[in-house]
Amino acid sequence: MNKKDYYWAKYMLIFGFFCISFGTSIFLKTEHAPDEAMRMLIPEYIVSHHTLPNGMEESVRHPLWGFSYALYPYLTAIISSVFMAITSLFTKSAAALLTAARLTSVLSGTGTLIVVFLIGEELFERRESALLSGIFVGFLPQFVFLSCYVNNDSFAVFTVALIIYFWIRGMKSAFCKKDCIGLGAGCGLCALSYYNAYAYLLCSILLFFALMIHFRKPAKEIFVKALAVFAIAFLIGGWFFIRNAVIHDGDLLGMRTSNESASLYAADEYKPENRQTPASEGWSFQQTYLQTPEGRTSNWLFSTVSSFIGSFSYMTVHLPMVLYLLYGALMAFGFLVFLFLGMVPHWFRKKPQLLLFVMLFLACLVTLFMDMYNTYFSDYQSQGRYLMPALVPLMVWIDDGYSSLTAKLPAEWKRASCHLTLLPGAVWLVLFLISYIGFLIPGCCMAS
């Protein structure tokens, strides 16, 4: 693929994604936007009071659950409040203010797509492979849905993509000044996104020191660069946790205070001490993750995988089984080919690439473990959005699989190789349009 065609396709995909997500954010009904009403309490409070909530105010506390999302990082709410304040200068329409608040998620999703293209350009020699990564990430139905309403998930994926991008650049430059600044910024933003993305903070530390030792950098340089990354991350993200600790008696993460608040103010059946969990019921691994609980239509595994692909509203608007199977087949085939053709030559033969692969895999594994742990011990949730921090690495590997397969074609098939590499992307876009037009729009934007 020549450079002109690549950039034309790239910018059209970015523009198309923005138009789809922004357009959907205008018409998406609030009752089909999970937890949005509870999250909207924070930017509404900021706009009304011109100050940040501490999380214990009644006006930001959910009457049923008894706690507030203001106890957890809420940078997205602060950004939304800025958009709402600007919009309020022109109109007081509730619909316009809601659309303004949703713009944070729209821009987070668009930003993710831009960064994923940059990741593809750094990782792959062929431009069509970079294009494929963006298609796989940006046009997954669930990711588009998350980019249309007020939540922390799309912003968390954006920060993860940013961190991975600077991992790759740092792998090539031994973390030059620009890459240290970029990694620090990514980590600081990630800290203010969602706890399920924190695996990338841990892996950033491990990868940074592993690469610096591999490049045999002097101890002084390692210390100075590590300090720079930490300082930038702390300047961006540290304020919230210090504020939490001061206000809530040392509770940096807000989790203890959240439980105490829920115990005091939640409806009886939602108080932490009364909440039934697989752990309190003594369920086995099989009962928790593989068997279908009473009152549910599918087990944890299927529900999580299907809602990672696309399950809208409060997981009540589903795609037909054939679409889940087609998406699953596309992903499974690409990943299997990656394991056999792409993993060893592209990721295992040079130590920096191996270290990058290990950290990406570890981050995905920790993300999965955290979700499974929370499901068993805290709150049974079979939602694919909790695994969204694994989206970018997973799709990059699937892309690598398809690219490795077409790279095996004979030299005289070079032109066909480009089209065949993009074929899975074309199929993916067709499946997305079917999912979007046939199910997301009727189920969440037009339903009464």
Residue ranges and their predicted role:
Residues 169-172, 200-234, 246-247:
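Perimembrane helix-loop-helix junctions
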Residues 70, 74-78, 89-111:
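Loop-to-helix entry region of an early transmembrane alpha helix in multi-pass inner-membrane enzymes
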Residues 224-338, 435-442:
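Membrane-lumen/periplasm interface segments of specific transmembrane helices
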Residues 17, 133-138, 187-191:
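Short helix- or helix-capping micro-motifs
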